A protein has these predicted regions:
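C-terminal alpha-helical interaction module
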Residues: 1-331
Length: 331
């Protein structure tokens, strides 16, 4: 899963692929799907300092990668370049070291992500997306699918830090892998992709189908999170990592910009407390750039906001005590 958010309305419609008369949003598939391996099945060995990630702070898919990088202590092992929240008119991401929170392309000095994709594949004809996992040794893209990238980081995190490979990632307990995958699947179409299906719907029926599924799933999670601290119990897992970036953007962006306005997340005490609980984990707040998030969506999507007037958004207290420790019997 990846993020592109074209600025020009015509290019936006092509890139987002609104599907004919149905008016339903269809997400573009990720093109680069190799992986890290230790068995020689791919040329990408998990090694210290070998990999670089390209992300946007606005993008919920890229945010997943930054969360795992922080929680597993991979900051010194995997370097990062951050695109501007602004985009070119064709929908491509650009670098801008003068923009707070963004950077230059630290590896190649390229002006944008599109050059990176063409360097990896001269025949690439699409629009480059983020996140990107880049192999410095082979000077190419390994993968641009967020779910697969975070699974690689969780699987090989010890080797990526130069440690014993026997250590299991705390975010991917072996006994919970099947449940983690099932939870990610359950949340993807209704929530992760559901906000986009609502926002980019081109018929009333498509919109109502999307928001109906979205809020139906949120209601289920409100009930679930009244009983469990995290999605699968007492343990923060990859399932939470895949959901959290979408939900923290909800009240700031999706509620108004994508017309997901039956209610706000702050109106759902269990979900809202869950989001604050994770935000307050050491290292998580530093992965959030609210300015990039707000300005990217509301400025870039000119088919939704043609005059690029960016609303001020809600005031949310992410450091308000969440009181969810009692659900797991500990802090």
């Amino acid at each position: 899963l990846n993020e592109l958010g074209p600025a020009a309305a015509v290019d936006q419609m092509k890139a987002w692929r609104a599907a004919g008369d149905s008016g339903k949003f269809l997400r573009k598939k990720s093109e680069f799907r190799s992986s890290l391996s230790t068995d020689g099945s791919t040329p990408h060995l998990p090694e210290v300092g070998r990999y670089h990630i390209y992300i946007s702070h606005a993008c919920p898919w890229a945010h997943r990668v930054m969360l795992v990088r922080s929680l597993l202590g991979l900051e010194d092992s995997i370097s990062v370049s951050v695109v501007d929240w602004r985009m070119e008119n064709d929908g491509s991401w650009i670098f801008n070291a003068d923009e707070p929170g963004a950077s230059e392309d630290h590896l190649h000095g390229y002006s944008g992500i599109q050059q990176l994709y063409l360097a990896a594949d001269p025949d690439f004809a699409g629009i480059g997306t983020v996140p990107v996992l880049w192999d410095k040794n082979h000077d190419t893209i390994v993968n641009n699918e967020s779910r697969e990238i975070i699974r690689m980081l969780n699987t090989h995190h010890s080797l990526l830090k130069g440690e014993d490979d026997s250590r299991t990632s705390p975010l991917l307990p072996s006994e919970l892998v099947d449940e983690i995958d099932a939870m990610i699947d359950a949340n993807y179409e209704s929530l992760n992709n559901g906000v986009y299906k609502a926002g980019f719907a081109r018929t009333q029926d498509a919109y109502e189908d999307a928001v109906g599924m979205l809020f139906g799933r949120l209601d289920e999670l409100e009930s679930l999170l009244g009983e469990h601290r995290y999605l699968l119990g007492d343990t923060l897992t990859e399932a939470d990592i895949c959901l959290w970036p979408t939900l923290i953007r909800f009240d700031l962006v999706y509620h108004t910009h994508f017309k997901c306005d039956r209610n706000r997340i702050v109106d759902m005490p269990n979900v809202w407390g869950y989001l604050r609980d994770i935000f307050q984990i050491h290292g998580i707040a530093e992965t959030c750039d609210w300015t990039h998030i707000k300005w990217h969506y509301k400025w870039s999507h000119t088919s939704i906001n043609p005059f690029r007037v960016v609303s001020i958004g809600p005031e949310l207290d992410w450091n308000e005590p969440h009181g969810r420790e009692a659900l797991s019997g500990g802090s």
